[in-house]
Swiss-Prot record:
DNA-binding region, residue range(s): 196-217, 244-267
PANTHER family in the cross-refs: ARAC-FAMILY TRANSCRIPTIONAL REGULATOR, HTH-TYPE TRANSCRIPTIONAL ACTIVATOR RHAR
Molecular function in Gene Ontology: DNA-binding transcription factor activity; sequence-specific DNA binding
UniProt-listed NCBIfam families: PRK13500.1, PRK13501.1, PRK13502.1
Gene this protein is translated from: rhaR
Protein name: HTH-type transcriptional activator RhaR
Gene3D superfamilies associated with the record: Homeodomain-like, Jelly Rolls
SMART domains, per the entry: HTH_ARAC
Residue span, HTH araC/xylS-type domain: 179-277
Subunit structure: Binds DNA as a dimer.
Chief localisation class: cytoplasm
InterPro entries in UniProt: AraC-bd, Homeodomain-like_sf, HTH_AraC, HTH_AraC-typ_CS, RhaR_RhaS-like_N, RmlC-like_jellyroll, RmlC_Cupin_sf, Tscrpt_act_RhaR
Amino acid sequence: MANQLILLKKDFFTDEQQAVTVADRYPQDVFAEHTHEFCELVMVWRGNGLHVLNERPYRITRGDLFYIRAEDKHSYTSVNDLVLQNIIYCPERLKLNVNWQAMIPGFQGAQWHPHWRLGSMGMNQARQVINQLEHESNGRDPLANEMAELLFGQLVMTLKRHRYATDDLPATSRETLLDKLITALANSLECPFALDAFCQQEQCSERVLRQQFRAQTGMTINQYLRQVRICHAQYLLQHSPLMVSEISMQCGFEDSNYFSVVFTRETGMTPSQWRHLSNQSD
């Protein structure tokens, strides 16, 4: 696309030898669709927003992790106190003898699964490494680039150790209630979610959990679940032949008329209009 915004290496890296650096987004503002001359890891710390990656929408919040390739198109909209960090790197500049393809999904043709989650323990460990990496990537001493690459290797191994699929928190995990709740919500796309039953199972206060969730994500639990379902509906409308009523059921709405009302309120167009517009742009 001739008018596609492309982020350039020269605007982010200090020289042609630097392989890795950190770009803070405190907060991340609305950002138009773009690609890059480099790759990046996106780690979300707080708040929420709509991340559209290769035309697929994701409602993102704390703990979301993305592996972005240079050619991927993505944008940020509907942001609310969204705080994230981009760890950007040039694969061709990496010199460390590490099996990067085993560590980074999509690295130079490796199998690509872009969206993962980190629990609180993984986030804490990753944050420590990223802080060191940011310090070294801003350094000017002769070994700064080598130290930054070593820390990048440590980071991608830490992420691989702690990441998990969005709907599959390991049963042995020692993660927090908030991590368990977000995983439970991801498993409730098609069926009702009962917060009282969740709190009874986890032996926690419903009121306190609601407060914690809102403080960390900037949304209520119901708002988050509704928007995750709408994102899934947008994807199905664009990429499946299912009827609107069938998509409504698959996204947790038993009444297709109510689904259409909610979808229109959240996106500004009806499900049929969304499908028509998406098919036109393909």
